[in-house]
């Protein structure tokens, strides 16, 4: 029987967080990371820095829009669409196959993140799920940025460094996947609601970027 989803999530993140501590790192055998995975780790670190800077600027610019983590209504646009935490479950926590993400892999990952064709099923599933997360956020951010650029006040728009960082990590993952459709709206944009949603998405994406960076660190070290 698998542990409860909430307990599993906490356990996974705690384990991944421990990998950051030098005391544990000294006790681990020194692996030889693949150049491809190391490249993806660099991209994930760049992405984390970019989203952190973008969020900080947004909180300063939109200080009257309730843009702090304590004030916003947290939302996960990937909920019920991807299962990154389960897909990236560390081998140390894998007791049986029923604890893995149940959906079959319909994606073929052939990007530079994979060291060879012998990459495990779990690694392929993990990287594919990360790719899907990034793709969904990329579509949302591009649609939102298009609205913000229409704002006569020109108060805020997305940092190109963050959009570039997303694109570079997507290219490194290079998953053959169905393109996420971008719904175009004919309605007059509500710039106030758009800026509120921007805050919500930036907070959610930073949390996801932290998770992705830890997953990449784990895969690079394993």
Curated annotation (Swiss-Prot):
Disulfide bond entries: 40-113, 67-199, 88-126
Species, as recorded: Felis catus (Cat)
GO biological process, one term: interleukin-12-mediated signaling pathway
Gene that this sequence comes from: IL12A
Predominant place of localization: secreted
Entry's localization field: Secreted
Quaternary assembly: Heterodimer with IL12B; disulfide-linked. This heterodimer is known as interleukin IL-12. Heterodimer with EBI3/IL27B; not disulfide-linked. This heterodimer is known as interleukin IL-35. Interacts with NBR1; this interaction promotes IL-12 secretion.
Gene Ontology MF annotations: cytokine activity; growth factor activity; interleukin-12 receptor binding
UniProt protein name: Interleukin-12 subunit alpha
Keywords recorded for this protein, A-Z: Cytokine, Disulfide bond, Glycoprotein, Growth factor, Secreted, Signal
Annotated family: Belongs to the IL-6 superfamily.
InterPro entries on file: 4_helix_cytokine-like_core, IL-12, IL-12_alpha
């Amino acid at each position: 029987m698998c542990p409860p989803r909430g307990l599993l999530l906490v356990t996974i993140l705690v384990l991944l967080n421990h990998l950051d501590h030098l005391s544990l790192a000294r006790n681990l055998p020194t692996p030889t990371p693949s150049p491809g995975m190391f490249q993806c780790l660099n991209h994930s670190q760049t992405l984390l820095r970019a989203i952190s800077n973008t969020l900080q600027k947004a909180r300063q610019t939109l200080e009257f829009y309730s843009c702090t983590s304590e004030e916003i209504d947290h939302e996960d646009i990937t909920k019920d669409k991807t299962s990154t935490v389960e897909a990236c479950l560390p081998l140390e926590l894998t007791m049986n196959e029923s604890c893995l993400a149940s959906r079959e892999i319909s994606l073929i990952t052939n990007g530079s993140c994979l060291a060879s064709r012998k990459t495990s099923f779990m690694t392929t599933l993990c990287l594919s799920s990360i790719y899907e997360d990034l793709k969904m956020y990329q579509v949302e951010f591009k649609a939102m940025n298009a609205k913000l650029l229409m704002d006569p006040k020109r108060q805020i728009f997305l940092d190109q460094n963050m959009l570039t960082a997303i694109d570079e990590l997507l290219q490194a993952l290079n998953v053959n996947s169905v393109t996420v459709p971008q719904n175009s709206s004919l309605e007059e944009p509500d710039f106030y609601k758009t800026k509120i949603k921007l805050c919500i998405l930036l907070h959610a994406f930073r949390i996801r970027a932290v998770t992705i960076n830890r997953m990449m660190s784990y895969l690079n070290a394993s």
